Amino acid sequence: MARIKPPFAYFGSKGRFYKEIKEIFEENYRENFVDLFAGSMEIPLNFKNEFGELKVLANVKDEKIECLLKEDALKVYKKGLEYIKHDLEVNARDLYTDEKTKFDEENKIFKNIFSECCPCCGKRLKNKKNHEIFNDNEKMVLKILMAFGGCSTSLSNSFYSPQKLQNLESYIKALKSIKITNNLFDENWEFENSFIFLGPPYIQKINKEEEQFIGYNYASDKGIHWSVKDDNRLIEFIKRNQNKNNVFLVFGSVNNNLSRLLKNNFECEFIVKEYKRVTFGKLAEKAEYFCLIK
């Protein structure tokens, strides 16, 4: 069965571990699958696709994804391609490689959706608050689908291909098959007969507040604070939902604060996955864990 893949880049996507997560789920099957930090929703969408009878809840608190859900993303994407005058017979990567001048022309038009730019070099002069065609939500959708995962106002070299268009159509269709909510995490939530997947925001330590962390794009471009206190709230959530025929699979970075709390509070099994990843042109070795609590 063909996998449903998000038609955009997403930091922290668990898709690379789909096979491992699926195996754990099959060994601990429940009638409900709950992903409380669902992000791009790659795992819940594919679980629903593979296990048709499964009841799936995906909670997403991410302004970029929420804009994608509010708008007719396929219509906005096609309107964006038409606006920059892109030939749908031409793959964006081929355009970037073989016709760089034409790519740069389309990129200038694209950047003008968000900013007033120099007509000669395309350099941004000032932000554009309003656009005559695209509203703010539509502009965010264009940034997600055509720029670098919503983090830029310049075209990526993969902004269009027939396969990307097909992936978007499949993704949008799949969204209609699951229940989606957009709530900040609450330790008082209660579930039963569920496989609960917990992958809290990717965190980055900041210098001024030793115990504070920032969840990458958890609620806005700047994120919101996710502290060690919030790790404690996650522990309380698990405790509240034990003894209700639930299974928990927690995902995180090796040796982080949450992993220590899990070891101290539960009988649990840790599975460490090592992999290599290229970030900004640099190859780095990564290690992350799954923690299974029954």
Over which residues does each language-model region extend?
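S-adenosyl-L-methionine
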Residues: 1-34, 42-46, 281
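Conserved SAM/SAH-binding loop
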Residues: 182-187
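Core SAM-dependent methyltransferase catalytic element
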Residues: 279-294
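Short, polar loop motifs at secondary-structure junctions
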Residues: 38-41, 164-168, 253-257
